[in-house]
Amino acid sequence: MKKKINRRTFLKVMGAAALAASAGGLSGCGSTGENGEESTIIRVAFNQPETHAEYIALADFGEKFAAATHGRYQVEIYPNAVLGDQGPVTEMIRTGALQLAVVPMSVPESYNSDFAIIAAPYLYDNLEQMETAAREGVFDPLFATTDKFNFEVVTLYTSGARHIYTNKPITKPEDLKGYKIRVQDSDTYIQMINLMGGVGIAMGQSEVYAAVQQHVIEGGENSEVVYNNFKHYEIAPYFSYTNHLVMTDVVVANKDFLDDMDEDTRTTFRKLMKESMEVEFAAWDQNIEDAKAVLDEHGVTFVEADIEAFRERCMPLLQSIANRSDMTREVYDKVQEIKAREA
């Protein structure tokens, strides 16, 4: 069952997040632990603000891991992409310049194309189905394939269902004709928007506001949270519920860093990382509620789209991803089993 975070718990975790935000520079060592030894600093790259559910989960993890290791490890989170965009950050993870980072699923997909199945267009009917799959370990075999690239996927976070926002209502595929829509740098998502009737344009998130203002593109696709955080309602005030993706981000860790831990510490690290997934799922619900309230205040028009019309357009893409390998077919089939249990 999906866990809900109450207001008291949310504020407590936010307090931990604020404490983590005040952590100092990029050195590999910091204050001393309970045994008098210098603490090892785990540096985490993150491209969203401190109020984001993923930040809250990371801060909660950091507090618990520091306590479990008696201060031998401390977590420092660097939000708002201050350490760079997600592509360069991934290379920093691989080389060991960073220990942890939150990246979109398109990053591991660039190393193993089978990752595309986890966030394939219209694979899920709702966010809860993806969360159930994550809890049941459906994606774990895929996560185990990145070791050879010197990073490990240590947990999964939701970044919510994604929808299209533009300067007009989008209710059916025909409404997107000729509309250039920003997507993550992924061939899959470019194809998806093309099939939905528009033109997919890969672009960094920080470029979207100016690109819409200058009529380089007509809009983007994302969750209510990101739409609000980047104030895209100012330049694209129609938010259309196409529900084309249920997106996930992953926390990736440098493999050498993990291998250098003693076995007990590594086990604790992985356990607490998995538990942070539930913190993030619950905090995400709160993020969505808060974002919608702000968007209402700014006069955003929410539009109900014909989801089945868009889904039908994207089915060939979904099936091509599902049939890519035995591993992708297994993930697809297990998600269908979850859907059947809900029916």
Residue ranges and their predicted role:
Residues 2-5, 9-19, 24, 30-128, ...:
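N-terminal secretory/targeting leader peptides
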Residues 130-134:
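A gly/proline- and charged-residue-enriched helix-loop-helix capping module
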Residues 143-144:
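Glycine-centered hinge/linker elements that transmit conformational signals in sensory
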